[in-house]
């Protein structure tokens, strides 16, 4: 490809509304342009990268035995009503009616459509297992689209759905998809972790996320220093302290704390170590509990894990915190003065709180705290559960090493759905015993557009993008210095361009009448891995300059050897 015949829409300045580096660089490198909030046009450079990501995904899915289909983006509402998600799904589901006043949705996902297809096409256990996938546009009406294509409203996704008659069969496909995903992201040159994850709104049993490590990531991922344990922080187990509870050494005292409405203020004003404080959080209780509110206790330096807490039988789902009026109606004290002593509510204490002694907490009286609280002496030991986020240095749940926490960008997610959708849509097959049985499902997604942004977040410097070779828009850039004034430079550049193309190498020849500085800046911004600089001075020595984008290393290579050299570099 020649730049004179190509849309090279690079920008010198960073657009003001671009928050993260991938969004900034995708705009500056001429990969995307914003059409409306959360909607982007993919320009030629961006589309080349997107197509390469898509091709790797398709190759590995086919290799793993999945079957490609294509399902409509527009879906009839009756399928969503049948599954129950018409009412459950929030405003992210874009609903509309056609000219016949029939309701439809723009598909954010395709569980209903594929389950409907399979229940009509598959009738016997002998036809299973089957794993269908598509690479298709999705639409989610995000309340606040942000970070460019990282969280857009319209995006490209690979979604796969497998159907089985036994859990063993589902497990086999799940493991095959886990392996396929690992190959996909490895081929793309990404530094990623597969982590145990919560199944969330999709539901089901087992679940793993594939997270690309990046400082800008929205997720906290946890992994062990001494094993392959890895989990999303929502799911990572916080073990009980190994030392157990120390003996009581202090009497309980009521202390005036009129200006201490938070743990930080309590610690600062009264010199109490933060690990000797307890936060009391009131949330709405489940109907089965028989109470309006339930108290959750976590140590002052720990954070409540809302995903874990929501799974408690006492807690209403979704988890919602009580407001001040609701709290005062039951306790007659504000949120900053709550504690477990004489609290007339069911209480769940985190494991770390249950192991505390001589601690401080609110007295359920405005402007007062108790110091020196001890379980069983001053307050009954409540229900104990793991309800906090782990922190760095906690012991790994598998007993090997301690935990580290890094930021990650979720690019893939695999689920064992079980019978959630087949039961709702009555998708059955005839089993070996001749009776109808529900199929069990797996679900496997990759955010194709998000992968592009995640790769940039992980691979860039102050000059621009540094693409992994497998997904770079071009493999080689040829920069001929003043080729319009030098016949020799032009001749060598054209010969090299034709030779590389004949070998199947994707090459961009910069034949613009531009200053060398502009040419260098654009190629580094776009992130092409291998750059060839052709100039009269080096040609005097029958040499060409080679530069590797990732390391910045430069070499002088003989004109006669440059094609073979580039082939070897690309094949590495």
Curated annotation (Swiss-Prot):
Gene Ontology BP, a term: prolyl-tRNA aminoacylation
GO CC terms, sorted: cytosol
Record EC number: 6.1.1.15
Any one GO MF annotation of this record: ATP binding
Primary location: cytoplasm
Keyword ATP-binding: yes
Annotated compartments: Cytoplasm
Transmembrane helix as UniProt keyword: no
InterPro entries assigned to the protein according to its UniProt record, in alphabetical order: aa-tRNA-synt_IIb (IPR002314), aa-tRNA-synth_II (IPR006195), aa-tRNA-synth_II/BPL/LPL (IPR045864), Anticodon-bd (IPR004154), Anticodon-bd_dom_sf (IPR036621), Pro-tRNA-ligase_IIa (IPR002316), Pro-tRNA-synth_IIa_bac-type (IPR004500), Pro-tRNA-Synthase_IIa_type1 (IPR023717)
Pfam families with a match to the protein in the record: HGTP_anticodon, tRNA-synt_2b, tRNA_edit
Catalytic reaction(s) noted: tRNA(Pro) + L-proline + ATP = L-prolyl-tRNA(Pro) + AMP + diphosphate
Alphabetical UniProt keywords: Aminoacyl-tRNA synthetase, ATP-binding, Cytoplasm, Ligase, Nucleotide-binding, Protein biosynthesis
CDD domains the UniProt entry points to: ProRS-INS, ProRS_anticodon_short, ProRS_core_prok
Described purpose of this protein according to its UniProt entry: Catalyzes the attachment of proline to tRNA(Pro) in a two-step reaction: proline is first activated by ATP to form Pro-AMP and then transferred to the acceptor end of tRNA(Pro). As ProRS can inadvertently accommodate and process non-cognate amino acids such as alanine and cysteine, to avoid such errors it has two additional distinct editing activities against alanine. One activity is designated as 'pretransfer' editing and involves the tRNA(Pro)-independent hydrolysis of activated Ala-AMP.
Assembly information from the UniProt record: Homodimer.
Family that this chain belongs to: Belongs to the class-II aminoacyl-tRNA synthetase family. ProS type 1 subfamily.
Record text about domains: Consists of three domains: the N-terminal catalytic domain, the editing domain and the C-terminal anticodon-binding domain.
Name by which UniProt lists this protein: Proline--tRNA ligase
Source organism per UniProt: Edwardsiella ictaluri (strain 93-146)
């Amino acid at each position: 490809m020649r730049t004179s015949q190509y849309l090279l829409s690079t920008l010198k300045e960073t657009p003001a509304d671009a928050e993260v580096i991938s969004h900034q660089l995708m705009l500056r490198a001429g990969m995307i342009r914003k059409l409306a909030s959360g909607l982007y046009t993919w320009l030629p450079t961006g589309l080349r990268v997107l197509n390469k990501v898509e091709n790797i995904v398709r190759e590995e899915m086919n290799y793993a035995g999945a079957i490609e289909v294509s399902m409509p983006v527009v879906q009839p509402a009756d399928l969503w009503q049948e599954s129950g998600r018409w009412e459950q799904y929030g405003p992210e589901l874009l609903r509309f009616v056609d000219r016949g006043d029939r309701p439809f949705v723009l598909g954010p996902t395709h569980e209903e459509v594929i389950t409907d297809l399979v229940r009509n096409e598959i009738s016997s256990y002998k036809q299973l297992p089957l794993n269908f996938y598509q690479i298709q546009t999705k639409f989610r009406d995000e309340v606040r689209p942000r970070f460019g294509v990282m969280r857009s409203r319209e995006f490209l996704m690979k979604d796969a759905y497998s159907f089985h008659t036994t859990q063993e069969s589902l497990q086999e496909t799940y493991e095959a998809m886990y392996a396929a995903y690992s190959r996909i992201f490895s081929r793309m040159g990404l530094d990623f972790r597969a982590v145990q994850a919560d199944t969330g709104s999709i539901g089901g049993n087992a679940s793993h996320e594939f997270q690309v490590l990046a400082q800008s990531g929205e997720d906290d991922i946890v992994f062990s220093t001494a094993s392959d344990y890895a989990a999303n922080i929502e799911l990572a187990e916080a073990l009980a302290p190994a030392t157990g509870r120390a003996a009581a050494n202090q009497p309980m005292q009521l202390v005036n704390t009129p200006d201490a409405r938070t743990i930080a203020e309590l610690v600062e004003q009264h010199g109490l170590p933060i690990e000797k404080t307890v936060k009391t959080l009131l949330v709405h209780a489940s109907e089965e509990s028989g109470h309006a509110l339930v108290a959750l206790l976590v140590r002052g330096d720990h954070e409540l894990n809302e995903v874990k807490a929501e799974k408690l039988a006492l807690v209403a789902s979704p988890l919602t915190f009580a407001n001040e009026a609701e709290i005062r109606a039951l306790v007659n004290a504000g949120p900053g003065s709550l504690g477990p002593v004489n609290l007339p509510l069911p209480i769940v204490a985190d494991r770390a709180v249950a192991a505390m002694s001589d601690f401080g907490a609110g007295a359920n009286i405005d402007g007062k705290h108790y110091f020196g609280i001890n379980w069983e002496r001053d307050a009954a030991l409540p229900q104990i559960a793991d309800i906090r986020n782990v922190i760095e240095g906690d012991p790994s749940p598998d007993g090997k090493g301690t935990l580290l926490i890094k930021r990650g960008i979720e690019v893939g997610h695999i689920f064992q759905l079980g019978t959630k959708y087949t039961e709702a849509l009555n998708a059955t097959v005839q089993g070996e015993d001749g009776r109808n049985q529900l199929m069990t499902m797996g679900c496997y997604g990759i955010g194709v557009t998000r992968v592009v942004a995640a790769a940039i977040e992980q691979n860039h410097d102050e000059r621009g993008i540094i693409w992994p070779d497998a997904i770079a828009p071009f493999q080689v850039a040829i920069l001929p210095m003043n080729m319009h004034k030098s016949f020799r430079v032009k001749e060598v550049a054209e010969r090299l361009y034709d030779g590389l193309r004949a070998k199947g190498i994707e090459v961009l020849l910069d034949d613009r009448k531009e200053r060398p500085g502009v040419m260098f800046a654009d190629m580094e911004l776009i992130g092409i891995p291998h750059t060839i600089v052709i100039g009269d001075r080096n040609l005097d020595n029958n040499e060409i300059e080679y530069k590797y984008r990732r390391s910045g290393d430069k070499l002088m290579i003989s004109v006669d050897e440059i094609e073979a050299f580039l082939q070897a570099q690309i094949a590495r």
